[in-house]
């Protein structure tokens, strides 16, 4: 039995999230259907992060076990030939038995793309969030600093969250403006259900002047979901990358086709 890892990208706007659900259109169902067609045998995948309805994947990682012997490029091209245009396998790689797409990961990174303009753009529908009033980027970055470190993030956790503990370690939040867009980057060991969208709701409240910077610390300390801002829209949220130990040599996400990806790649080079 061989263990194969895949890097998967998808436009999540047409799907009811990642996880398979009866009578619902999900990314997992489409991927496993395509793998079954290509492999001519049922394939069950394990995913790094279960994204919600409308959330996109740039650097999603899955693994599955199979007795089939196929070249890496065959897994990519063969599976893609049975996938819709909104999902694509980017790479395939044999892995040792100890590799696990979810439990071997030590961090996840999400991007949020926010369009700030008086009028919404239909060209960005489902690809970016939108607010019609200007935002104070400096205030949002200062507010984000209150969240860094290991905390109980119950105030940013949905009622449907199944995580065993609300304690997570948030390593990094970056906020950067580029023209009519504000870009956010969140990096943590793991995230709770709706956590990034709930963080976004609070950051936008602060950026829009509806709450002071210090309010973020009060929300965190409250551990009360009702004390925080409403859950923000999913449209601009992307699972950007999943971090693994170097021993697994997991390929980096192929994000060159995403124009705004230069926001963070250029920053890394400076």
Curated annotation (Swiss-Prot):
Domain of life: Bacteria
Pfam families: PseudoU_synth_1
Molecular functions (GO terms): RNA binding; tRNA pseudouridine(38-40) synthase activity
Residues reported in the UniProt entry to bind substrate: 110
Keywords recorded for this protein, A-Z: Isomerase, tRNA processing
Reactions catalysed according to its record: uridine(38/39/40) in tRNA = pseudouridine(38/39/40) in tRNA
Gene3D superfamilies: Pseudouridine synthase I, catalytic domain, C-terminal subdomain, Pseudouridine synthase I, catalytic domain, N-terminal subdomain
EC number(s) recorded for this UniProt protein: 5.4.99.12
GO BP term (any one): tRNA pseudouridine synthesis
PANTHER family for the chain: PSEUDOURIDYLATE SYNTHASE, TRNA PSEUDOURIDINE SYNTHASE-LIKE 1
Family: Belongs to the tRNA pseudouridine synthase TruA family.
Subunit structure: Homodimer.
Record's protein name: tRNA pseudouridine synthase A
